[in-house]
Amino acid sequence: MKTRVVLILALSVCIEAASEVIRARAYIFKAEAGKIPTELIGTIDFDQSGSFLKLNGSVSGLAAGKHGFHIHEKGDTGNGCLSAGGHYNPHKLSHGAPDDSNRHIGDLGNIESPASGDTLISVSDSLASLSGQYSIIGRSVVIHEKTDDLGRGTSDQSKTTGNAGSRLACGTIGTVEERILETTTASLPPVTQSQPIGSSSYYYSTFYLPIILYFLLSRIL
């Protein structure tokens, strides 16, 4: 009887953890050719609200105009942000606009910089998520040199990258505690990436563990 109770409690805890709303942050660094970027130019906070992921933040030093804004598959920001790999696209679809039914999970469209001052970022997306099998935690957010053509252009790169040009800045997306979200970027509080990018252990812990526990529970009961 005790074993049953323990397993039921363990299963409920795992299910609750898997569905828990996670908040995340990415510190944005200016790309440096061949190097890991070190110049901090902004911060972006991620907040899951129902089925929508909300991104809010600001970045400095961008040229006026629109810049492609994407989630990339890896959290490695080395080599001038090139080590982040391509757009996060686990379903192998063509590049598109944020409101397209077929698009990369990482396709967040464009952000727009003013003629002077910081670039304010306010984006909502219904496809990217901070939890589940296709979580973007531990991946990277990348800001590009040019406007993303949203897959509507005539360039050969339109259907893969939106022809958005080189990578100007990037940052790894990591989970944070509520108290850290209230701090400034100057103090650079710790951001936690609980599992390496591309590691199956993260997906097993959030997606498969409740299923495994349910199987064990059904065998015992």
Curated annotation (Swiss-Prot):
Stretch forming the signal peptide: 1-19
| Cofactor(s) it depends on | Cu cation; Zn(2+)
Listed as disulfide-bonded, the cysteine pairs are 81-170
What domain of life does the native source organism fall in?
Eukaryota
Q: Where does Zn(2+) bind?
A: 87, 95, 104, 107
UniProt keyword terms in alphabetical order: Antioxidant, Copper, Disulfide bond, Glycoprotein, Membrane, Metal-binding, Oxidoreductase, Secreted, Signal, Zinc
Similarity section: Belongs to the Cu-Zn superoxide dismutase family.
Q: Give a short account of what the protein does.
A: Protects cells against oxidative stress by converting superoxide radicals to hydrogen peroxide. Oxidative stress is involved in various biological dysfunctions and senescence.
* Name of this protein: Extracellular superoxide dismutase [Cu-Zn]
Q: What is the lineage of its organism?
A: Eukaryota, Metazoa, Ecdysozoa, Nematoda, Chromadorea
> What gene name does this entry carry?
sod-4
